[in-house]
Amino acid sequence: MAKGFRGGFGGMGGNMGALMQQAQKMQRDIEAAKAEIDALEVDATAGGGVVKILISGTHEIKSLEIDPSAVDPDDVEMLQDMIVAAYNEASRKLAEISAEKMSKATGGAQLPF
């Protein structure tokens, strides 16, 4: 063995165990945050409230309510636009909440998910 060689990883020695524990805790926190996000329900409206949507944390539509006044057979495109707008708003809200929860779980580290 070379003189002065103590083994380990660049002198990190005892810190490696602590680093592994920290990584495992972060992994558990991330999994808990993902489960919490999946269980979320986020709502949004469009057209002054005539279209209401509720989506899950997995982006599935849970409910869609359309006020009868929004149904105009001569302007189906307007209703389609309101549904898309409501879904996009709910999805944006969900992304914001998800980013906040993941940031807390990772201690602010920007990790790809």
Question: Predicted segment positions?
Answer:
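Long amphipathic alpha-helical segments used for membrane anchoring, targeting, substrate engagement
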Residues: 1-38, 93-113
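Stable alpha-helical structural segments in soluble proteins, enriched in small hydrophobic residues
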Residues: 82, 86-97
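Short beta-strands and strand-coil junctions in structured, solvent-facing domains, enriched
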Residues: 50-52, 72-73, 91
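Short, contiguous, helix-prone interaction/anchoring segments in small proteins
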Residues: 22-63
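Amphipathic, hydrophobic secondary-structure cores in small proteins
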Residues: 65-73, 83
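Conserved acidic
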Residues: 15, 75-82
